[in-house]
Structure formats: C-alpha cells, structure tokens
Curated annotation (Swiss-Prot):
Family: Belongs to the bacterial ribosomal protein bS20 family.
Gene Ontology terms for molecular function: small ribosomal subunit rRNA binding; structural constituent of ribosome
PANTHER family xref list: 30S RIBOSOMAL PROTEIN S20, SMALL RIBOSOMAL SUBUNIT PROTEIN BS20C
Pfam families: Ribosomal_S20p (PF01649)
SUPFAM superfamilies for the chain: Ribosomal protein S20 (SSF46992)
Keywords: Ribonucleoprotein, Ribosomal protein, RNA-binding, rRNA-binding
Species, as recorded: Neorickettsia sennetsu (strain ATCC VR-367 / Miyayama) (Ehrlichia sennetsu)
UniProt-recorded name of the protein: Small ribosomal subunit protein bS20
Gene3D superfamilies hit by this protein: Ribosomal protein S20
Cellular component GO terms, alphabetical: small ribosomal subunit
Length: 87
C-alpha cells in the first residue's frame, strides 16, 4: 500500500496509463483481426487495403510504447506475407 502522497499519486497515474495502454493494444488487435479476416474470406485487394489501414496503427503502438518495434515489424511482415501468398 502506498504510504506517501507522491506514491499514492503514482498509483493513480499508473492506473490511468494502464487503461490507456490496454485501449491502444485492443485497438491494434482489432485492426490485426480485420486483416486476418480479410485474408481468410476476401479478395487480395480487400486484404491489402485492410493491411494498409492497420499498418500505421501498429506502428503507432511502437511510438506510444505499447509494442516493441521488432514485434510490430514481425506482425506486419507476416500479414503482408500471407497477402502475397493469396491468389
């Protein structure tokens, strides 16, 4: 339990930051899910468009500190690889 005023304030700040980070990660996951769904059902153009929309969102996660840059690159690389394999 936080004893000092500054420690109590830090607990409040961490709670706020955690909530924001959870929302950001949820948003990123939603975009990735949309791309995967487009790859599974739609034509190649729809999947490519979904990735084009998702890519800035994924890299924004890196900028905001919720994703490691290598993980973001891996996600984008794998999704684009799946799109390239589409007929």
């Amino acid at each position: 339990m936080a004893n000092t005023a500054s420690a109590k304030k830090m607990v409040r700040k961490i709670k706020r930051r955690t909530l924001v980070n959870k929302m950001r990660m949820s948003r990123i996951r939603t975009f990735v899910r949309k791309v995967r769904k487009a790859i599974a059902v739609g034509p190649k153009s729809a999947a490519a468009e979904a990735l084009r929309v998702a890519q800035p969102e994924i890299h924004r996660g890196v900028t905001k500190g919720v994703l490691h840059k290598n993980r973001a690159a891996r996600i984008v690389s794998r999704l684009s690889g799946h799109i390239k394999k589409m007929a």
